[in-house]
Curated annotation (Swiss-Prot):
Protein name, UniProt field: Fibroblast growth factor-binding protein 1
Domain of life: Eukaryota
More info: Expression is significantly up-regulated in skin papillomas and carcinomas.
Signal peptide: 1-20
Residues modified by glycosylation: 175
Organ and tissue specificity: Expressed in intestine, ovary, lung, placenta and normal and wounded skin.
Membrane topology summary: Peripheral membrane protein
Disulphide linkage map: 74-91, 100-133, 109-145, 214-251, 231-239
Protein's organism: Mus musculus
Gene responsible for this protein: Fgfbp1
Disordered: annotated segments: 25-62, 160-189
Residue ranges, annotated region (Sufficient for interaction with FGF2 and FGF2-induced effects): 210-251
Biased composition (Basic and acidic residues): 170-182
Keyword Signal: yes
Length: 251
């Protein structure tokens, strides 16, 4: 009876020890599994965050301002098309406004996480341009894409002699106004002189000194000198006439 009790007790001890080992192993494995589950669950969220950040960066890099080597102040912005993109440039230079469009397809290049480098190199190429929008052979090339992806080069698609050129409205209106005023002044001045001469026939008689003795008359000489000083050669005869009317002389 005593032997039977000892055997039963030993079996109970072995079972207890085995159970405790299982519990200990589960406790060790539990943190690893929860950590792995946490990593697996957070992986999609991290991917979404990276994609959002990348899209924001791309949008901020696809527009901007620049000044070319020949001092044209410009803005540029990118628009997505069905196939590729279009890059519109709007510039102001020497009181003229003009614009043009470059087009290409950098989609395959941008798939390799090169969008930041690509757009920075595009902006640098724009700043190096001369006669922008005027050269039909203009191509915006980038080092990062041009060898493996030649379709990523942006070519000028609407070249003109000066792009879509428009004069600035304010300055054009002012210059036209000034031109009209000058033309009116030039056209009316000769008519005024003719009217003065035709309305006053005595002027021609007075200006043509009939008596040679009048040439030596001090009053006449003084009038001619005063007219030359204040009116100049072109208007001296008319001024002499008015002085002769105001100052009665023997001639």
């Amino acid at each position: 009876m005593r032997l039977h009790s000892l055997i039963l007790l030993s079996f109970l001890l072995l079972a207890t020890q085995a159970f405790s080992e299982k519990v200990r192993k589960r406790a060790k494995n539990a943190p690893h599994s929860t950590a792995e589950e946490g990593v697996e669950g957070s992986a999609p969220s991290l991917g979404k965050a990276q994609n959002k950040q990348r899209s924001r960066t791309s949008k901020s890099l696809t527009h901007g301002k620049f000044v070319t080597k020949d001092q044209a102040t410009c803005r540029w912005a990118v628009t997505e098309e069905e196939q590729g993109i279009s890059l519109k440039v709007q510039c102001t230079q020497a009181d003229q406004e003009f614009s043009c469009v470059f087009a290409g397809d950098p989609t395959d290049c941008l798939k390799h996480d090169k969008d930041q480098i690509y757009w920075k190199q595009v902006a640098r190429t724009l700043r190096k341009q001369k006669n922008i929008c005027r050269n039909a052979k203009s191509v915006l090339k980038t080092r990062v894409c041009r060898k493996r992806f030649p379709e990523s080069n942006l070519k000028l698609v609407n070249p003109n002699a000066r792009g879509n050129t428009k004069p600035r409205k304010e300055k054009a209106e002012v210059s036209a106004r000034e031109h009209n005023k000058v033309q009116e002044a030039v056209s009316t001045e000769p008519n005024r002189v003719k009217e003065d001469i035709t309305l006053n026939p005595a002027a021609t008689q007075t200006m043509a000194i009939r008596d040679p003795e009048c040439l030596e008359d001090p009053d006449v000489l003084n009038q001619r000198k005063t007219a030359l000083e204040f009116c100049g050669e072109s208007w001296s005869s008319i001024c002499t006439f008015f002085l002769n009317m105001l100052q009665a002389t023997s001639c």
